[in-house]
Amino acid sequence: MDNEYLKTTGRIFDIQRFSVHDGPGIRTIVFLKGCALRCRWCCNPESQEFKIQNMVMNGKTKVVGRDVTVDEVMEEVLKDVPYYRRSGGGLTLSGGESLLQPDFAAALLRAAKENGLNTAIESTGFAPFENIQKLLPYLDLYLMDIKHTDSATHKAFTGQPNELIKANAKLIAENCGHLIIRTPVIPGFNDTPA
């Protein structure tokens, strides 16, 4: 078996163990750096820039972001295999936007699948479909955020239109085994009656 892919390098800003919200069962979430959207309400603003940053948090300067190999990430992920097996959990990639590091994301998902883990990605879908295709062979669940259906409103609040996101949602639905579309309800943005 060719294990060269385990040396693939990517940039992350966090690994969160024992999550139960982003896929089935108990999961480890790997947060990748970099996102093309600039959502005003972003819960992970430290994820938006791809570069490693010094940020002030709670009055202290903290380095946000680090370069890691797939092997290094999997060493952390595999610590909780008994919990995944018992709960049907596994690995979820989040961000930022994992699709902006497609080779690293695909290699992480491949490593998880080769270790018998359930895999998921939480994503905006704002990337070329070719990036998504790299992940599909190793993906059990695609959790897709669709923030607004109106492109002008979407652009006003995220910095980007949503045509690519909607086109990718259709393609993902046709090509991925399991797609769940989620919409964060944001007051003043998408919380009005239809």
Spans of model-derived segments:
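Conserved AdoMet/S-adenosylmethionine-binding subsite of the radical SAM
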Residues: M74, L78-A194
